[in-house]
Structure formats: structure tokens, C-alpha cells
């Protein structure tokens, strides 16, 4: 069904030491605000639109950008967090507070590619034939009982972890409440998000 997506591991060897943020933007204003936030906390070593090709069955696409980043040493030290927790909290904060911006991939030397489309169309749209990976995960439809939107397609990712699954997480609300006690925020309208965190 609709809601296809892929995650490729090993696709950015030239930036293997940097976090690769893949971001959906609904508006230019959201992009500008998100970039200001990224620049406050990270050194951006490269940024670009993620290459795509027009596809007749992929529509209503957001702006899709990628940023290769490293935490600013002063910000990381002031946070008193380890690097991975610093990045995870930043991603969750942006996704929770910045309307119109969604960081859907944030790992090192890997990236998620997803859309409102069938998997074969999503692969063509993102020109995945141009990427070389040592491992891929993929999924073919939106999670059960969730609304269809670009960010809601599998796989779900945080840092280097990606999750795809079939079925429903029956204890979603209990899991959501538990992880929210640790500062994680569930904003993606799906039970799968809990597993990723």
C-alpha cells in the first residue's frame, strides 16, 4: 500500500563521521527557522536538497533537504549529555516544537527515504539506484490505524536505528507515557514511534 520507505546503511562514506539529517519542510519559513536552530547547535559541513525525480504517483511533496552536521563542542559540553543523546534530544525538540519541519533521519552514514507512495515509486522518486549501501530496510505501507502523511511512512528512525513492523502495538499508550517521562515526545501519529525511541 501507500506509505513506502527505505533506510540505507553505508550510503554516505564521505561523511561517515557526521550526522545526516534528512528533513521535510512544509514552508520556506519552517526551513529558515529550522536551519537557524541547526546552526545554533551544530557545525553544518554540507547541506543540499535531496535529489529526487518527478514521479506521476508521488504528489504533494514537501521540500526535502539533508544536512551533514557535528555538534558544536561548546553546546555539547554545556548540555552535559553524551553526543548521541544531545542529537536525539535536538531531533525530538525540533519535531515537537517547530511546525512544518520534521527531521525524519538523523544517523551517521545512513539515511531514510520515505513518501506517500508505493515502495517501487518511492525508490524511483529518490533515485535510490544512485546509492550504495551494505544494508537496507524497507516497508510497503503506513502503520495500521494511522493517518497517511509523508512523515508517517515506515521506516521510523532516530540516530542509527530504524524500525519497520507489521500490525499494531497494542500497548502504545502505556509505552508512550513511559518514554515521555524521559523527555521523549511522540508526535508522529503512529505506534511505531515508541519502538524507535
Predicted regions: what is each one?
Residues 1-197:
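Conserved short alpha-helical segments that host acidic/polar catalytic motifs at enzyme active sites
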Amino acid at each position: 500500500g501507500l506509505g513506502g520507505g527505505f533506510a540505507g546503511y553505508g550510503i554516505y562514506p564521505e561523511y561517515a563521521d557526521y550526522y545526516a539529517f534528512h528533513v521535510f519542510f512544509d514552508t520556506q519559513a519552517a526551513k529558515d527557522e529550522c536551519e537557524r536552530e541547526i546552526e545554533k547547535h551544530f557545525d553544518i559541513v554540507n547541506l543540499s536538497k535531496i535529489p529526487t525525480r518527478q514521479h506521476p504517483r508521488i504528489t504533494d511533496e514537501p521540500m526535502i533537504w539533508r544536512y551533514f552536521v557535528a555538534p558544536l563542542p561548546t553546546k555539547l559540553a554545556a548540555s552535559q549529555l553524551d553526543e548521541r543523546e544531545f542529537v536525539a534530544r535536538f531531533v525530538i525538540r525540533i519535531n515537537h516544537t517547530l511546525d512544518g519541519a520534521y527531521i525524519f533521519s538523523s544517523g551517521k552514514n545512513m539515511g531514510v527515504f520515505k513518501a506517500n507512495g508505493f515502495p517501487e515509486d518511492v525508490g524511483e522518486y529518490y533515485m535510490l539506484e544512485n546509492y550504495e549501501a551494505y544494508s537496507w530496510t524497507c516497508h510497503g505501507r503506513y502503520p495500521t490505524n494511522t493517518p497517511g502523511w509523508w512523515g508517517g511512512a515506515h521506516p521510523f528512525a532516530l540516530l542509527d536505528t530504524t524500525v519497520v513492523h507489521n500490525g499494531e502495538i497494542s500497548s502504545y499508550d502505556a509505552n508512550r507515557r513511559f518514554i515521555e517521562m524521559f523527555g521523549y515526545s511522540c508526535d508522529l501519529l503512529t505506534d511505531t514511534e515508541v519502538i524507535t525511541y
